[in-house]
Amino acid sequence: MSSRYSLRQTPRKKELFEGMVETPIRRSRSARRQTSQPLSDVETDSTVEILPQPTEVLPQPTRRRTARFKEELDSDTDSDNMGAVNRAANGKTNGHANGNGNGYTNGHGNGNGHATNGHATSNGAAPIQAVIEKTKGVSHDPHVVDGWRPGQDPKVDYSGEVEFGGSFGTAAMMTLFPVLMWYMWIGATYYDGKFPSRTEGQSWSEFGAHLANLVYTGAFPRLQVWAWYWSYLIVEGAFYCLLPGVWGYGKPLPHEGGKQLPYYCNAYWSLYTTLACLAGLHYSGIWPLYTAVDEFGPLLSVAILSGFLVSIVAYFSALWRGKQHRMTGYPIYDFFMGAELNPRMFGILDFKMFFEVRMPWYILLILSLGTAARQHEQYGYVSGEVWFLVMAHFLYANACAKGEELIITTWDMYYEKWGFMLIFWNLAGVPLSYCHCTIYLANHHPDVYRWNRGILAAMFVGYLFWYWVWDSCNSQKNRFRAMEKGKLVLRNTFPQVPWQTIHNPKTIVSPQGTILVDGWYGLARKIHYTADVWFAVSWGLITGFESPFPWFYPVFFCCMIAHRAARDIHRCRRKYGDAWLEYERRVPYLFIPYVI
């Protein structure tokens, strides 16, 4: 996931990259957690390398020193002068952030991916060209963000805008998406990967009753599966609180007078500790990895019901404690979007942060590993196609984990509330609907979907190439922002790919911020979206074309990413004005250099 925009603010500790401060060397008294200190007071350890601030370059037409604070290339909404906000609002203001782009975890994503993931507004859905024409020459007051003005009550949404069709649309989504997930499971399990349909002479009511009976008998949420699912959630919560990690700070919160919340980031340690525990459970026979695949139906039901239960508790708990934020007054819509902005427990466990990576992407990886274990158990080998998905899902989960500190300044963390949308999507939607490529391979003999070995090798190479593009381009923009802060900390987390840092980059400077016009973003403005599309299509393509369900995620994602690109263009034009037009003139390609 990648962050979207920065807010000017009152002076505070130096940051290594946006929102992050270097942690001190561990003291013998505690080896569990690092703490944040001013940069000048800390030492580096063997896991990080600090690069000096880039040498200042005299202003030139195409290669210029960046401004005091930096906006990422894909920043898509307004910046806010926090000093002015703090003085005018006196700690009682409300603000809107920007959209979530892709980066680590698109989710995912935008991300985060994811993300991951980013949620577009209803007025950003126009075709890209229409958005370009609509936003030409639009000026912007940086002190007004999405209709918010200093002094407004943070518990009330003053924007006058709703997303996803308001109450009707969100009610439909909360009803139909779980039904779709069960429907796809039925097709994958009982209809050989095809769409379930009526038999000759079967009425619609009989067909519906038949499907409901299949869910009841094959996907009943047994108590044992509840125990597995919630044990995993609780153990991951313990890992979040207890394993080593680094501290970072989120974006300043206008309604809190510019307060920056601390976030603890240790998803990287959590991932490898989780994998070690799973290996022990598998080889000891206590919980073989293929159990996740064999019990996919009950697991699906438990995840869906858990999504609703956690959403209900989160919503009414926020109302009871008076923690609601930016409420529209429409209960169904507010339940979907959420009531509380920053729910936390024990002073360290941030629920939005916790659910963003560990639940969706780790579970997706567990299902792929379970499929590999099942094939090895049945056939004595693991097919190349399954290895491809294990590689793909590991790289994605690992990228989300190694770049977790970059998630804390994204749209999901800063702006989205903890409601049904985030809760259900992370607990059930992402891991148990994006996984149908894995489920198809698990349910069929390798001969059914076997690719030519040369084509399969080309798919591995192509995926690794686009992973390099995706990882390096997100690193370029985040490291550029960190270097503008004066210091850059390199965490030696695996894998480290080439071309992650651009020294003395070309930029376009505007009063609203600086636009990076170099590296990958000097070739195409949304090339990281292209990489994400490649990932999604590859997940479907590896299964072939015999079943529609592995293609649910690629089709869904491509529609979503086109919508997001239109929204990004709309907001960047409003934010940067002529500077963004100049960027489009210099970099005319949106997705693929020299093509489109």
UniProtKB/Swiss-Prot annotation:
Disulfide bonds: none
Name assigned to this protein: Delta(24(24(1)))-sterol reductase
Listed GO CC annotations: endoplasmic reticulum membrane
Disruption-associated phenotype: Abolishes the production of ergosterol and leads to the accumulation of sterol intermediates. Leads to reduced deoxynivalenol (DON) production. Results in reduced mycelial growth as well as less conidia. Leads to decreased virulence. Exhibits a significantly increased sensitivity to the divalent cations Cu(2+), Mg(2+) and Ca(2+), as well as to the trivalent cations Fe(3+) and Al(3+). Shows increased resistance to cell wall-degrading enzymes and significantly increases sensitivity to osmotic stress mediated by NaCl and D-sorbitol, and to oxidative stress generated by H(2)O(2) and paraquat.
Compartments it resides in: Endoplasmic reticulum membrane
Native source species: Gibberella zeae (strain ATCC MYA-4620 / CBS 123657 / FGSC 9075 / NRRL 31084 / PH-1) (Wheat head blight fungus)
Listed GO biological process terms: ergosterol biosynthetic process
Lineage: Eukaryota, Fungi, Dikarya, Ascomycota, Pezizomycotina
Start-end of Gly residues biased regions: 98-112
Keyword Transmembrane: yes
Pathway: Steroid metabolism; ergosterol biosynthesis
Extra facts: In Fusarium, the biosynthesis pathway of the sterol precursors leading to the prevalent sterol ergosterol differs from yeast. The ringsystem of lanosterol in S.cerevisiae is firstly demethylised in three enzymatic steps leading to the intermediate zymosterol and secondly a methyl group is added to zymosterol by the sterol 24-C-methyltransferase to form fecosterol. In Fusarium, lanosterol is firstly transmethylated by the sterol 24-C-methyltransferase leading to the intermediate eburicol and secondly demethylated in three steps to form fecosterol.
Binding site for NADP(+): K477, R481, L516, H528, Y529, D568, C572, R573, R574, K575, Y576, Y583
Function: Delta(24(24(1)))-sterol reductase; part of the third module of ergosterol biosynthesis pathway that includes the late steps of the pathway. ERG4 catalyzes the last step of ergosterol biosynthesis by converting ergosta-5,7,22,24(28)-tetraen-3beta-ol into ergosterol. The third module or late pathway involves the ergosterol synthesis itself through consecutive reactions that mainly occur in the endoplasmic reticulum (ER) membrane. Firstly, the squalene synthase ERG9 catalyzes the condensation of 2 farnesyl pyrophosphate moieties to form squalene, which is the precursor of all steroids.
Renumbered residue ranges of the record's region Disordered: 1-122
EC number per UniProt: 1.3.1.71
Similarity comment text for this entry: Belongs to the ERG4/ERG24 family.
Catalysed reactions, semicolon-separated: ergosterol + NADP(+) = ergosta-5,7,22,24(28)-tetraen-3beta-ol + NADPH + H(+)
Membrane topology: Multi-pass membrane protein
Keyword annotations from UniProtKB, A to Z: Endoplasmic reticulum, Lipid biosynthesis, Lipid metabolism, Membrane, NADP, Oxidoreductase, Steroid biosynthesis, Steroid metabolism, Sterol biosynthesis, Sterol metabolism, Transmembrane, Transmembrane helix, Virulence
Molecular functions (GO terms): Delta24(24-1) sterol reductase activity
Residue intervals passing through the bilayer: 168-188, 225-245, 269-289, 296-316, 353-373, 381-401, 419-439, 454-474, 535-557
